[in-house]
């Protein structure tokens, strides 16, 4: 009996090790960075050197539109959800390649999106893709500045 249980546990562990890596996964050293320029403002959750990012939000100043880019492992599904303090929105994203030929999912939403409004108020943001979620550290001040630059 115990051998059957141990064999089952071993098989489950072996199968678990073959599971695909989550599409959404942050490195421990990642942090938010806000990059305002004359033509575009970008809020990125990235490594300190800026060489790898998980999520980028960008907009032309006062355009009312926000571009969402999820820097992720190649994904078969292009449905991404963002959640902030109880608000949740889903976005149909386009799979493609970024400037460094890295896989990305990209889409556009309005600066008036309820999730982005809550993100600006609370700094709380969680990203979901392909059944996996990643809570990002609070960034209220940077989120508020970013959203203020995007609103009409």
Set out the residue ranges of the language-model regions.
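Bacterial N-terminal signal peptides that target proteins for export
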Residues: 1-7
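Bacterial Sec-type N-terminal signal peptides, specifically the leucine/valine-rich hydrophobic h-region
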Residues: 12-15
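Bacterial signal peptide processing site
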Residues: 19-21
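Post-signal peptide N-terminal segment of mature Sec-exported envelope proteins
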Residues: 26-47
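A short, compositionally biased
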Residues: 36-41, 74-78, 119-124
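Short, surface-exposed binding/anchoring microloops in extracellular/periplasmic proteins
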Residues: 47-76
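Extended low-complexity, serine/threonine- and proline-enriched intrinsically disordered segments
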Residues: 76-89
């Amino acid at each position: 009996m115990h051998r059957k249980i141990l064999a089952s546990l071993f098989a489950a562990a072996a199968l678990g090790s073959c599971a695909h890596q989550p599409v959404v996964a942050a490195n421990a050293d990642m942090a938010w960075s806000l990059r305002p320029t004359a033509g575009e403002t970008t809020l990125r959750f990235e490594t300190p050197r800026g060489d790898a990012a998980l999520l980028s939000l960008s907009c032309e100043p006062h355009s009312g539109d926000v571009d969402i880019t999820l820097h992720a492992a190649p994904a078969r599904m292009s449905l991404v959800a963002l959640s902030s303090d109880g608000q949740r929105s889903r976005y149909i994203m386009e799979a493609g390649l970024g400037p460094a030929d890295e896989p990305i999912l990209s889409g556009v939403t309005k600066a008036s999106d309820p999730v982005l409004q809550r993100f600006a108020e609370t700094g709380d943001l969680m990203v979901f893709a392909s059944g996996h979620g990643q809570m990002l550290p609070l960034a209220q001040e940077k989120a508020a500045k970013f959203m203020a630059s995007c609103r009409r």
